Amino acid sequence: MEHALIELDWADIGWMLGLLGAAIALLQWQGLNLTGQLLWAGGRTILQLIVVGYFLAVVFSLDNPWAVLLVLAIMLTIAAVVARNRINPRSKSLFGWLWLSLGASTAISLGYALVVIIQPPQWYSPQYLIPLTGMILGQTMNSASLAGERLASAIQQNPREIETHLCLGATPGQAIASYRRAAIRASLIPTVNQMMVVGLVSLPGMLTGQVLAGGDPLNASVYQILIMFLILLTNTLSTIAVTATVYRQYFNQHQQLLV
């Protein structure tokens, strides 16, 4: 039997603060002075999600492709900035390449899902495009950041080995190939682990959201399968593209290592 989603109001948000207060009190009891940090994080959580809620309500009411694309562009830009800051905040050119890499990988996987599987009445339907992009982009941002940071660290820590390969005639791509494969493999471990335990240990956002909204649990499970495979493909594409971009930051036009 399906029931409508129980709506929460501002008074309920006040009660939610009790959860934050309990966490702060427990940490203070353990001698961890994280009160300011947690209050700041909690305040940002409330403010950001309330603003996003109102903003998305406006976008949904407009039903305009340009409004939807603006939202996606903002999400992509923030993801690229966060990934750049994790990998190499001093690089000026890395942001643009990350923006293209994350955007292209997300567009490829989402395009397949929308055209072949979901087939919404309008390609820009915000009901599907915005939440799907948000779930996928958040995951691929983390995977790309992990792969890029791991590869950058490996190059910085092993300059002699890389230069030895270069002296023996290897190209930059060949010289760092083992580090790149290790970085891609490490970045995909969380995704694979999540796929192994989904439905057993954790109930992901798409599934729980539809069930809470009164949707059919089986249909929600099918949508979650789609999300998991979309995340896998997008993470794979983005880590391949990002690592290819990152290692080129460490070589000049003469194929010399810059570390």
From Swiss-Prot:
It is a multi-pass membrane protein. It is found in: Cell membrane. It comes from the Bacteria. InterPro entries: UPF0014_fam. Belongs to the UPF0014 family. PANTHER family: PROTEIN ALUMINUM SENSITIVE 3, UPF0014 INNER MEMBRANE PROTEIN YBBM-RELATED. This is UPF0014 membrane protein slr1647. It comes from Synechocystis sp. (strain ATCC 27184 / PCC 6803 / Kazusa).
